[in-house]
């Protein structure tokens, strides 16, 4: 997550479907296999409270056969609009994003987004290649701290190390997709300085890489 990301950056219009809410049901989020090998099995659920927007989110990080999945429901405002967001993000054993499914419910409409990636920098939506985010290995959903876990786990930075990466940042509620340049600096074990443009925040994470405290925003209030 990054507040106000993507301003002044080139963007690709989200391949999102926007419909009248009364005619649409929640789309099931299907599991799919991934190449690679699994690590230690995990199934961790966390509840976050956003001190900035007063939003809340319940997210589960779990092992797949050969990768990992974030599955979550968030209640939050975005641009003054109350949202209910359900999403899954599947990553491979190296924590590179492979599939993203997002479902957004608004007062009078719903929107959906589906992305796939090959784990080497190529992205697609509805079988159309997304050249504007080519080279990105991570997705960053703008309403959650969950996707900060992905580069943290993928990069495996040691204290004192810094990495600058490009990510596929998804804005809410528009679901437009923006290439965002971000930087992670490992300050100490479990502590990071996150930067993007002029924005900067201190992150505290647990042993699984899940955010415990996101400066000025999200804080974990329950976990198990």
Q: How should each PLM-predicted stretch be described?
A:
Residues 11-12:
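Cysteine-centered motifs
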Residues 20-25, 31-41:
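Short, Lys/Arg-enriched N-terminal segments with co-localized hydrophobic residues
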Residues 41-58, 63-64, 110-189:
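Solvent-exposed helix/loop surface patches that form functional interfaces
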Residues 44-92:
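Short N-terminal edge-element motif at the start of the domain
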Residues 78-126:
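Hydrophobic/aromatic-rich structural module bridging two neighboring secondary-structure elements via a short loop
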Residues 195-224:
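C-terminal structured interaction module
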